[in-house]
């Protein structure tokens, strides 16, 4: 089977030259642009690049276009099913925010093939990762505690719903208006009624269980990132100054890849396991 690949630069070029589905994605003038060449400003993730689109007729939207290997027809069909399930708000899923989305099969035209896209509401706010570290620097223990409780609630709601997620991290949870949590990455969204695809993404290295690259879809290890986030927020809510020592502003709240790979050698694990206040709480 022929494998198609695409670069971000090719996606931007197609948007600039109107080689895309204008009817479904919207006029080029609505796509956020900027320097140095006044071209579409894309926010690249691990497998897709996201553009902001403002329109007088529609709400502000996020347009997610995959780069690298183009999704297969099977993947597109699966995402369409997931989109319909989200719209139905089954099993009380309206109690927490899995952001709904539409799948545009023929979205961007590059050479002799078409690239799909996901279109979803634009969520204004800060990522959990950014907000948590900002709160810690500001010594906002109350804010950190509220974030922790919100993540705990999110985990419980996942357990009660038919949905699950294969790539939770501090970067794909947005904190929007009124402190609401929004999961903005639907690529590894799961539903009990849909057959799971082959394992292709192993999760963010600062959140995922190290054994993820040796297993198939497994709910317990897919919830492991939530535990990493809860422990990180709990530790920061008790001792915000940990933000000055552990984690980084780009990839992690507290834990980094080496902490999860080699906990016995981790300074962070050693601190948390031997700190009286952390243990007692």
Which role does the model predict for each range below?
Residues 235-281:
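Helical subdomain adjoining the active site within ATP-dependent kinase catalytic cores
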Residues 197-212:
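Conserved activation segment of eukaryotic-like protein kinases, specifically the C-terminal portion
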Residues 211-221:
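Conserved end of the kinase activation segment
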Residues 155-176:
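Catalytic-loop of the protein kinase fold
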Residues 1-41, 78:
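Juxta-kinase regulatory segment immediately upstream of eukaryotic protein kinase catalytic domains
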Residues 36-40, 46-99:
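ATP-binding glycine-rich loop module of kinase domains
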Residues 97-145, 196:
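Conserved structural core of kinase catalytic domains
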């Amino acid at each position: 089977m022929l494998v198609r690949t695409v670069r971000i630069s090719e996606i931007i070029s197609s948007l600039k030259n109107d080689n895309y589905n204008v009817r479904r994605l919207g006029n080029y003038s609505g796509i956020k642009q900027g320097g140095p060449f006044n071209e579409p400003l894309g926010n690249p993730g691990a497998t897709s690049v996201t553009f902001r689109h403002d329109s007088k007729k529609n709400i502000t939207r996020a347009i997610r276009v995959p780069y690298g290997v183009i999704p297969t027809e099977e993947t597109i069909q699966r995402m369409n099913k997931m989109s319909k399930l989200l719209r139905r708000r089954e099993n009380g899923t309206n109690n927490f925010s899995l952001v709904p989305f539409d799948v545009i099969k023929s979205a961007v035209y590059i050479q002799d093939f078409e690239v799909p896209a996901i279109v979803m509401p634009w969520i204004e706010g800060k990522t959990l990762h950014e907000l948590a570290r900002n709160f810690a620097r500001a010594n906002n223990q109350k804010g950190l505690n509220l974030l922790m409780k919100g993540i705990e609630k999110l985990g419980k709601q996942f357990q009660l719903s038919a949905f699950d997620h294969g790539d939770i991290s501090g970067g794909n949870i947005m904190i929007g208006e009124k402190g609401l949590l929004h999961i903005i990455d639907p690529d590894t969204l799961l539903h009990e009624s849909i057959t799971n695809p082959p394992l292709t993404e192993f999760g963010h290295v600062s959140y995922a269980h190290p054994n993820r690259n040796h297993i198939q879809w497994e709910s317990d290890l897919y919830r492991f990132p939530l535990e990493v986030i809860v422990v990180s927020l709990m530790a920061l809510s008790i001792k915000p100054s940990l933000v000055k020592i552990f984690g980084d502003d780009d990839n992690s709240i507290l834990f980094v890849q080496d902490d999860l790979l080699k906990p016995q050698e981790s300074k962070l694990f050693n601190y948390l396991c031997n700190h009286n206040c952390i243990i007692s709480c």
